Amino acid sequence: MKKIVIVGSGTIATATARLLAKKCTHYFDVSLIARHLATAHQICADVLRQYGVVVACYQCDALDKSRLVPMLCRIKAELVINLATPDTHLEVMKACLESRCHYVDTAAFEAASDFNVPPPWYSAETRLKKAFSQAKLTAVLSIGFDPGIVNCFCAKAKQDEFDDILEIDMLCANNGTHDYFFATNFNPSVNLKELCEVTSYREAGQWHTAPPFSRSRRYAMPGVGEHLLYSVGHEEVHSLAKKFPKARIEFWVRVSDQFRQTLQTLERIGLISWDKVNVGNVHVAPIDVLAALMPAPASLAPSYKGQVCVAVVLKGRKQGAAHSMMYYSVCSHEACFEDIGAHVTAYTTAVPVVAAAQMILEGDWNAGTLVHPEELNPDRFLARICELGMSWQASSLSAAQVSKGDLINICADDTPA
């Protein structure tokens, strides 16, 4: 069996461990490394209880490369799935180089102090590309759903449907409801920072930025209906800009009025801040206090009801004529919970990262260098995520459907991929 290591112990790491235990028992020998051993023990005990699979657990701060390298060597890790916070990425990547194992993650690196990082992103990771190439090791960056699967949708579209792609809009709409007034689907500090930062998008070969919640569109989407989506800075815009330099590229996400108004109120009173303040004898960042008071993201799963649609809408040219396509997936919170006890966000990040790990170790995605998902062959990967539990579809769109009216309706004429 292939030896892989999960680094991290949050919502996504838990879902990934469960998915590996349920669907890849005879494929992987899994270990888990977490900053807090008690959390690691809890995940491993959960996996053993539910699936009868033993996952070895270890304690190490992912930022402590001096301890992480010998630990990976003792485990004889062949691949690391880094699901810790984004500030750990560079140190874990360097640890993989020193211990000679492949690497995957699900987001871009950002230091804990970073805020409003100017585009383009990924410059820190790119500096390690030569080292991965020389070592003939593979690092696949940001292989979740969005970013990740959506990047592969774009590669699939270019391969099969377009001579030239001129516009790429990535959409994420969660119409789910749960028992909590204000909660995030993954690490609150990371999720809230993303929404409070300026948005960045690509147009006419140039980078543009705009204040948060200042750009919006209303879409009617498969499975979730009509929603107002906001432009938010997101990883896939920055990597896809290299593959499609002429295209207008932007990411849009649904944020409910209640969530947005609450977030903006918390920001105005200073609770969405990473600058530490003194409270009695304690020196603490307000965001850490808020995160401690918010529900744990994994706790949303049992009460979550509804669906999530993630889609990529592409416009361009095919054989000299205008052409538009949509690639998308609709997932149910209830179905994801029934499968591995996770909500959609956790489930649809675990599935692609496991698929990528399999394909690297099988050789199909063993690029021997540092790459983004859109640089790899999408066909086997998109088939593999279906095998692991995620379906997707593709459909042509008419000119009327993608026109910039008050409502962009992309629901009609669905065709299975």
What are these regions (language model features)?
Residues 107-137:
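Rossmann-fold NAD(P)-binding glycine/threonine-rich loop
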Residues 35-39:
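Helix N-cap at the beta1-alpha1 junction of Rossmann-like dinucleotide-binding domains, i.e.
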Residues 159-417:
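C-terminal catalytic/substrate-binding lobe primarily of soluble NAD(P)-dependent oxidoreductases
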Residues 62-74:
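Conserved Rossmann-fold cofactor-binding substructure of NAD(P)-dependent oxidoreductases
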Residues 9-10:
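Glycine-rich Rossmann-fold phosphate-binding loop(s) that bind the pyrophosphate
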Residues 50-64:
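Rossmann-fold cofactor-recognition segment
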Residues 13-14:
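N-terminal Rossmann-fold NAD(P) dinucleotide-binding loop
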